[in-house]
Amino acid sequence: MAAVPSTISWPQRLEQLLQGQDLSASEASSLMQAWLAEELSPVQTGAFLAGLRAKGMVADELAAMASVLRGACPLPCDRPNLAMVDTCGTGGDGADTFNISTAVAFTAAALGVNVAKHGNRSASGKVGSADVLEGLGLNLKAPLASVVEAISTTGVTFLFAPAWHPALVNLAPLRRSLGVRTVFNLLGPLVNPLQPQAQVLGVARADLLDPMAGALDQLGLDRAVVVHGAGGLDEASLAGANELRMVEAGKPIATRFVSPDDLGLAAAPLEALRGGDLADNQRILENVLKGEATPAQIDVVAFNTALVLWVAGVELDLKAAARRASDTLRDGLPWQKLQDLQRALSHGNGQ
């Protein structure tokens, strides 16, 4: 749809948003800047969040807002001159799986990919990546410079989102009080402070594939995969065909459907990927990284790791990539990567 004019007031913008009109990139940027500067009242902010959710986000809006948030998050030291990958999902699939993308991060790192994992605690009953990693001994309060430097020494790091985006802290109570998912759930995966050149991003709804892929393309990534998993997962699933958007710089975004058998993996129902409470998810993640998990747990991590190897340019044949990931998992090498990161972040707190 046509964007609303840029000279109108916030109430006029809201009115046209409620009529289904998209924001222009400049208006989306202005809205995010106003939120960060606390220029809008809580009522206005809640109305805009609800209006954007009801209308549905488009790539231009997501990319513009993400660019503002990226600019509001300066690094505490120089960015390492490394090609990096992030692996994450938007959440919201309600499937209560174990922490698949977290396992993928350490598996990919064990295969030589530099992984900058951006994550948070759970916003619902599901155990978030930060929750499970903290439970396994990772220091979430490590100095930010140490977090950045860790990727150079270990090949993997974990950026705990609240430590990097303090400007969003004031919005957190309002978002919680709304009780529904908002644009910020979509922006989280787009605002990794280290700005990786490649990314695997999972979405729980098929209608988010194109907006998120378009946003990643506009943000200038070299390669990315946006995946909507069979059964509604926000990562590749073993339950059937998974719908992908393949993003490559300078090329049209491509659609691909990939099933587990395409990668030489066995199909499995979603129940085989279930997690549980924090203790359950810690145990499953440790077992996966040590190569002691169930075949389905190993296979789903291998599937998603194959996508990481593709975006990183390490292995462009997904079947071969999945085989490499499976071998690495069975050797228990990803567990060593987690231990390496634990040691790198073990000292110090705060900035």
Swiss-Prot record:
What reaction is this protein's catalytic activity? Answer: N-(5-phospho-beta-D-ribosyl)anthranilate + diphosphate = 5-phospho-alpha-D-ribose 1-diphosphate + anthranilate
One of the record's GO molecular function terms: magnesium ion binding
Cofactor dependency? Mg(2+)
Report the record's disulfide bonds.
none
Q: What is its EC number?
A: 2.4.2.18
Q: Which UniProt keywords apply?
A: Amino-acid biosynthesis, Aromatic amino acid biosynthesis, Glycosyltransferase, Magnesium, Metal-binding, Transferase, Tryptophan biosynthesis
Binding residues annotated for anthranilate 1, in chain numbering: G89, N120
Amino acids binding Mg(2+) 1: S101, E235
Protein residues bound to Mg(2+) 2? D234, E235
**Cofactor annotation comment:** Binds 2 magnesium ions per monomer.
User: Would you tell me the protein name for this molecule?
Assistant: Anthranilate phosphoribosyltransferase
Species name: Synechococcus sp. (strain CC9902)
